[in-house]
Amino acid sequence: MSLVNEKLKLENIRSALIRQEDTIIFNFLERAQFPRNEKVYKSGKEGCLNLENYDGSFLNYLLHEEEKVYALVRRYASPEEYPFTDNLPEPILPKFSGKFPLHPNNVNVNSEILEYYINEIVPKISSPGDDFDNYGSTVVCDIRCLQSLSRRIHYGKFVAEAKYLANPEKYKKLILARDIKGIENEIVDAAQEERVLKRLHYKALNYGRDAADPTKPSDRINADCVASIYKDYVIPMTKKVEVDYLLARLL
């Protein structure tokens, strides 16, 4: 079986999504060790940078600088990775050989992910406060969180493509009719979502515990908080990506 077909098998997709849960939780744990440090998200005089010809936030600055390097090595040529910033250089490596499993598309919700992360997720996983000495470490952790969230949410395209290929005629009718509600009804699996939330809660509860004293309740991260981030944002945003991808599937 080809690599393309393997990546679109639902059991392989679910396995990838489960591994991504681990990455997201560990990245949240890393970010939780630092206070909110709101200045790293502010622009201009409200922020923490004093650079000539740059008026943006520290987070946006480092994000763009890092993504420029990643772009050079083809990270964003992969159907699993999407940049948060623009004006990136062309890869210095040749184009990938072989066929990608996804239909060509321009779906990228990273601007929405970035806004939600700063305004909603950071306040939930970090405590109030400012630690100037750890601004750099804070933003490095932020970027890891953003990258893992983006990968998880955009992986919905693989789910959508797999479901489309399983019943193309049904999806073609819904797509041609621009029946968003009908598409949503087809892609939703409430029982699976509930299993995901229970698994996430269990992982966050245990990953946050001190290995030296596993009976002690975790104070590193709130498991209810992690599950709520998935329920209120990650899952709904993944559905949005799936729908947007399918609506463009026949173009």
Curated annotation (Swiss-Prot):
<dbReference type="GO" id="GO:0005737">
    <property type="term" value="C:cytoplasm"/>
</dbReference>
<dbReference type="GO" id="GO:0004106">
    <property type="term" value="F:chorismate mutase activity"/>
</dbReference>
<feature type="binding site">
    <location>
        <position position="74"/>
    </location>
    <ligand>
        <name>L-tyrosine</name>
    </ligand>
</feature>
<dbReference type="GO" id="GO:0005634">
    <property type="term" value="C:nucleus"/>
</dbReference>
<dbReference type="GO" id="GO:0046417">
    <property type="term" value="P:chorismate metabolic process"/>
</dbReference>
<dbReference type="InterPro" id="IPR036263">
    <property type="entry name" value="Chorismate_II_sf"/>
</dbReference>
<keyword id="KW-0584">Phenylalanine biosynthesis</keyword>
<dbReference type="InterPro" id="IPR008238">
    <property type="entry name" value="Chorismate_mutase_AroQ_euk"/>
</dbReference>
<dbReference type="InterPro" id="IPR002701">
    <property type="entry name" value="CM_II_prokaryot"/>
</dbReference>
<keyword id="KW-0827">Tyrosine biosynthesis</keyword>
<feature type="binding site">
    <location>
        <position position="137"/>
    </location>
    <ligand>
        <name>L-tyrosine</name>
    </ligand>
</feature>
<keyword id="KW-0021">Allosteric enzyme</keyword>
<feature type="binding site">
    <location>
        <position position="134"/>
    </location>
    <ligand>
        <name>L-tyrosine</name>
    </ligand>
</feature>
<keyword id="KW-0963">Cytoplasm</keyword>
<feature type="binding site">
    <location>
        <position position="136"/>
    </location>
    <ligand>
        <name>L-tyrosine</name>
    </ligand>
</feature>
<feature type="binding site">
    <location>
        <position position="136"/>
    </location>
    <ligand>
        <name>L-tryptophan</name>
    </ligand>
</feature>
<feature type="binding site">
    <location>
        <position position="134"/>
    </location>
    <ligand>
        <name>L-tryptophan</name>
    </ligand>
</feature>
<comment type="pathway">
    <text>Metabolic intermediate biosynthesis; prephenate biosynthesis; prephenate from chorismate: step 1/1.</text>
</comment>
<dbReference type="GO" id="GO:0009073">
    <property type="term" value="P:aromatic amino acid family biosynthetic process"/>
</dbReference>
<feature type="binding site">
    <location>
        <position position="75"/>
    </location>
    <ligand>
        <name>L-tyrosine</name>
    </ligand>
</feature>
<protein>
    <recommendedName>
        <fullName>Chorismate mutase</fullName>
        <ecNumber>5.4.99.5</ecNumber>
    </recommendedName>
</protein>
<feature type="binding site">
    <location>
        <position position="137"/>
    </location>
    <ligand>
        <name>L-tryptophan</name>
    </ligand>
</feature>
<keyword id="KW-0413">Isomerase</keyword>
<keyword id="KW-0028">Amino-acid biosynthesis</keyword>
<dbReference type="GO" id="GO:0006571">
    <property type="term" value="P:tyrosine biosynthetic process"/>
</dbReference>
<dbReference type="GO" id="GO:0009094">
    <property type="term" value="P:L-phenylalanine biosynthetic process"/>
</dbReference>
<keyword id="KW-0057">Aromatic amino acid biosynthesis</keyword>
<dbReference type="GO" id="GO:0005829">
    <property type="term" value="C:cytosol"/>
</dbReference>
<comment type="function">
    <text>Catalyzes the Claisen rearrangement of chorismate to prephenate. Acts at the first branch point in the aromatic amino acid pathway where it steers biosynthesis towards phenylalanine and tyrosine, and away from tryptophan.</text>
</comment>
<dbReference type="InterPro" id="IPR037039">
    <property type="entry name" value="CM_AroQ_sf_eucaryotic"/>
</dbReference>
<feature type="domain" description="Chorismate mutase">
    <location>
        <begin position="1"/>
        <end position="251"/>
    </location>
</feature>
<dbReference type="Pfam" id="PF01817">
    <property type="entry name" value="CM_2"/>
</dbReference>
<comment type="subunit">
    <text>Homodimer.</text>
</comment>
